[in-house]
Amino acid sequence: MKQSKMFIPTLREVPSDADSKSHQLLLKAGMIKQVASGVYSYLPIAKRVLNKIESIVREEMEAIDGVEILMPALQPSELWSESGRWQSYGAELMRMTDRHGREFALGPTHEEIITSLVRDELKSYKKLPVTLFQIQNKFRDEKRPRFGLLRGREFIMKDAYSFHATEASLDETYQDMYNAYSKIFSRLNLQFRPVIADSGAIGGSHTHEFMALAEIGEDTICYTDGSDYAANIEKAEVVYHPNKKHTEENVLEKVHTPGVKTAQQLADFLKRDLDEIVKSMIVKVDDQFVMFLIRGHHELNDIKVKSFFGTEHVEMATDDDIRSILDASPGSLGPVGVNKIDIYADNSVQDLNNLAVGANEDDYHYVNANVDRDFNVKAYGDFRFILEGEPAADGSGPVKFAEGIEIGQVFKLGTKYSESMNATFLNDQGRAEPMIMGCYGIGVSRTLSAVIEQHNDDKGIIWPTAITPYEVHIISVNPKQEVQKNLADQLYDTYRTQYEVLYDDRAERAGVKFNDADLIGIPVRVVVGKQAADGIVEVKNRRTGDAVEVHIDNLQETIQSIYASFES
């Protein structure tokens, strides 16, 4: 393709609102254009890369017998009401009403549509299992779109759904998908980790996220060097080993603590370590308020709270809620004397006695509070985030932390949707049973950004060979000079039958062309310049920056050698 005919509106300056490396490079390289907050047009270079990512995804899906379909983005509310998600999904669901008053959503996922489709068409165990997938635009009304394509309101996604007669069949497809995802991300030359994760609003009993390692990542990955253990910090289990100090219970004492509102301030005031302080917080679970106790150096994990209670409806109580329950401010909460609501405590609180807690009165705290004597705990559990250095759940050693971008996720949905939507099949005994489901997503546009986050330098993008928009970039330094133009034209005509070639034939300064070439990041650059009359060109390896001068008779061999070095 001749660059003079292409649409690549590169920028010289980094846009001020671009808040990640990939966002900056996508804009500077003329690959995307913002239409609205979190909404982008994909320009020719980006579209070529997306096409290649999608091609790899299709190959691996078809290799495990996935069948491609295309479902509507516009989904009627009736189907979402059947599953119960029309009421529960939340503000991220983009809803609308047509001229006839009928309600619709722009789909963030397609569980309802696919379940409706399959329940109407597949009635016998003989037709199962089946796996259907699509690649389509999705929509989510993000409160704060950020990081360009990493958190947008419209995004491209591959979503697949499998239907089964038995759990064993689901297990097999789940593992096939897990392996296929690993192959896809390996082919994209991504550094990634599959991690144990939470299923969120989609639901299900078992799930893994695929995380691309990146400093900009919004998720924290917990892993160890001693095994392949990895978990999203939301799901990383804290293994409790009792370590109770058997000290004498002291007399409960109320202490005046003027201006003390945080656990750290209380620790400083009492001259205690932070881990000896107990924080109290009130949480609304469904329609009930409960109190949670955790040690001062720990943080409450709402995902674990949701899992413990089996609900998606968990939120921190407001200041007004707290005052109506305990007539106290958040900075002075404590369990002593609390009997209106149930009290739950993190496992590690069991190791303490003579606790320092709030007194439910501004500027006062209790010291020497003890469980059973001064207050009752209904249940203990793992309610907190793990800390770096604590033992991993599989016993393989201390956990380490890394940041990651979620680029894919696989779920075992079970019968969550088939039961609520009456998607049944007849088993070999002629009895109706709910289909057992799995669902599997890859953020295609998100993956594009993740690749750029990992593959760049201070000059621009460095594309992995599998998804580079073009394989060879021919640059005519001065197309006004006939010798240079003729040789560049000749090389373009010769090599475009063997490679995907972008030919910069523009009447631009050499510096502009070289800067654009570095920015766009095509792996091999062939520069036709002052030595064109002698048949000499410069060949540059974008990945290493190495450049050599070769005669055009040896150009093919040189290009092949560079690509061979990428493979090794």
UniProtKB/Swiss-Prot annotation:
Protein name according to UniProt: Proline--tRNA ligase
Q: Where in the cell is it found?
A: Cytoplasm
Q: Its principal location?
A: cytoplasm
Q: What keywords would UniProt list here?
A: Aminoacyl-tRNA synthetase, ATP-binding, Cytoplasm, Ligase, Nucleotide-binding, Protein biosynthesis
Q: Which GO terms describe its biological process?
A: prolyl-tRNA aminoacylation
Q: Which family does it belong to?
A: Belongs to the class-II aminoacyl-tRNA synthetase family. ProS type 1 subfamily.
Question: Where does this protein come from, organism-wise?
Answer: Macrococcus caseolyticus (strain JCSC5402) (Macrococcoides caseolyticum)
The record's annotation in PROSITE patterns points to: AA_TRNA_LIGASE_II
Q: SUPFAM superfamilies, from UniProt?
A: Class II aaRS ABD-related, Class II aaRS and biotin synthetases, YbaK/ProRS associated domain
Catalytic reactions of this protein: tRNA(Pro) + L-proline + ATP = L-prolyl-tRNA(Pro) + AMP + diphosphate
Keyword Protein biosynthesis tagged: yes
Q: What is known of its domains?
A: Consists of three domains: the N-terminal catalytic domain, the editing domain and the C-terminal anticodon-binding domain.
